[in-house]
Amino acid sequence: MAFIATLSTGSGTATIRLAGELDAATAPEFHDAIDDAVATGAARLVIDASELTYIASAGLRALVFARQKVAEDVTISLVGVTEPVLKVIKMAGLDHGFDITAS
C-alpha cells in the first residue's frame, strides 16, 4: 500500500489521516501535512493512524516534529493506532506526549 497523508479540517480541529508505511521515504509527506495543519490555526490536531501499517524511526521523528511545530496549547491525539504501531511508539517513549487511542 502506498503511503497517504490526507488533511481535513473543521470545528477547530485539523485531522491528518495516515495510511500505509511511515518511514524515511514517506516522512516528508507527513511533514508537509503537519505544516498545512499548523497553518490552519486549529486548536486540536488529530492523527488518524487506523490505516498506518508500519512506523519506522523516521516516522517517530515526524511525530516529534509534529509536537514541536504546533503551539503548546494545541492537543495532539493519535487515534485508531494499531497494536504493532503502538508498540513501537511505546518502545520509543513517545506515548507520553500524545493522547493515544488504540484501535
What do these predicted ranges mean?
Residues M1-R17:
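Short beta-strand/loop segment at the start of cytosolic alpha/beta domains
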Residues A24-G97:
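Amphipathic alpha-helical interaction surfaces in cytosolic regulatory modules
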Residues D99-S103:
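Short acidic-hydrophobic, aromatic-tinged amphipathic segments that line or gate anion-handling sites
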